[in-house]
Structure formats: structure tokens, C-alpha cells
Amino acid sequence: MNCKEGTDSSCGCRGNDEKKMLKCVVVGDGAVGKTCLLMSYANDAFPEEYVPTVFDHYAVTVTVGGKQHLLGLYDTAGQEDYNQLRPLSYPNTDVFLICFSVVNPASYHNVQEEWVPELKDCMPHVPYVLIGTQIDLRDDPKTLARLLYMKEKPLTYEHGVKLAKAIGAQCYLECSALTQKGLKAVFDEAILTIFHPKKKKKRCSEGHSCCSII
């Protein structure tokens, strides 16, 4: 069975012995766009409504080094109510994507305060990539007005690079699930991190990953 595009936890492809299952788990505050990120990539469609996630699973077929692999994409709930339940999806993870919204400063600060400590406590040896989401809202008038009212501003690419270095993330990438700008690069980097988890430092430039040795 070919699971490319739009498969979920009901897919029976995990029994396909010809493909190795790679596990990517997405974490971050609620409403930062984790589900949209996964659905836009897996189904090539942006979801119309926001529904808080408890747990969901998608799978896509990827080719790495001429071999096909199943990339399991695991969505998690960011709300505090699920702090005890969420880590149940962590075992056997190959890479984590830690997400924050570039128009939600609180979600940015919670990466270092909440999410990195949780991952280091539960899965200390698994690499993680830092992802800035919702970049299409950086220039959205309503979003800018809301941030201005709260005396805040959108987070810049440089903010993401700085945080990635501070937390020991392998890379910083940013994307929009709505426009799909940078979306494929996020999951390409996740796959690369699984197979080559330690990277040499690179000079960071906007729109490209900022990688560092962890």
C-alpha cells in the first residue's frame, strides 16, 4: 500500500516490511499551528477549522538514499491538561520538531521554559529541530494590531536562530502551513536529522536552516 499523501493512524502501512518507519513527533504550545503544519504537508491541504489535538498520527512515504521509508508524523496536544498523556507518544521517537508561532511571543518563551525541559526529561538523547510557524501572519494587519495592543511585535528570523543556539537545537527553520512556504524544508531537515543527527555549524541566512552541533 502506498501511504503517500493523506494517510492517518488508520493506515495499515506499518506492516510493510520493505519500508522502515521513521518517527517524528511535533510539540509546542496549543494553537501555534502544529496540526496545520502536519496536515498541510501530509494532505497538501490547509485545515479550515481549528480543533485542539489530543493525539493524531499521519504517515507519508519518503525516499532517502534511494530507499523508501515511512515517515510517521505524530501530532500532540500543547495544553497543560495533557501534560501526563502527551509523553505516552514519545517512546521510539527519532526526531522532535519543537514549534512556536512567530506571532505568539509566549509560545517562543515556552520553548525554553516548558518544551525543552520536558523533552530532556523524557527523551534526552533524541535530537530536536526548532520550527517557527505562521510566518504568513508577520504582515497580517489584524495580527499586527493585536500584537501592538499587547505592546508586542512578531518574532524575527534572528530570534529563532538565537533560541535554537540557546537550546541546542540542530537547526532553526520557519514556515507557513497556509502558503506552504518553507514547509517541505522542515520535513526534509527532520529526515536529515534522523540519519545525520550531528551537524557542523553553518552560517545562517534567512530562509535556510541554522544547524549546530548538540
From Swiss-Prot:
PANTHER family on file: RHO FAMILY GTPASE (PTHR24072)
GO molecular function, one term: GTPase activity
Propeptide residue intervals: 212-214
Compartments it resides in: Cell membrane
Major location category of this protein: membrane
Entry PTM: Palmitoylated; regulates localization to the plasma membrane and may be mediated by GLUL.
Functional note: Plasma membrane-associated small GTPase specifically involved in angiogenesis. Required for endothelial cell migration during vascular development via its interaction with GLUL. Elicits the formation of F-actin-rich structures, thereby regulating endothelial cell migration.
Gene: RHOJ
Any Gene Ontology biological process: regulation of cell shape
Protein name: Rho-related GTP-binding protein RhoJ
Consequence of substituting C3A: Impaired localization to the plasma membrane
Keyword GTP-binding among record annotations: yes
Induction of its expression: Expression is regulated by the transcription factor ERG.
Family, per entry: Belongs to the small GTPase superfamily. Rho family.
GO CC annotation terms, alphabetical: extracellular exosome; plasma membrane
Motif (Effector region): 50-58
Impact when changing T35N: Dominant negative mutant
Organism, scientific name: Homo sapiens
